[in-house]
């Protein structure tokens, strides 16, 4: 099995957006929602309209809250632009509360993992990216959360990892970047 990596360069992410958007809106939104939420692909492909709608029929953060008794929740809100794109997509495609968000055009059933893989892998190949697969989406989310300053322990809990080293390896942080300096001037 090939080792997949996060997509670290934001220009590569933008290129993936463009490639997928040109193919179709569903594939673009699958990718965008995946890298903005860190949801497992098995969860993503089974999302329904109700999972991304509030009662007032507007987009909300996907029901993607990590919970453990005694520990506060971790919320991952969606960017407003993504919410608007999801709203428009659902209206255009007639996706109701009980309909799958990312469904096969032929069967109206959820995309299979194999279909999702082909979508992401083909777009990556078109953009000259190697070592990109479905797990890359979750890794991309975690990597960019780490780069934006989200504490590693929060990312570890969100991903369900047992150790910090597992999380660092998952997001492909080089060993030389793993040193943390605490300097106090009391």
Region locations from a protein language model:
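Conserved catalytic core of the tyrosine transesterase superfamily
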Residues: 1-186
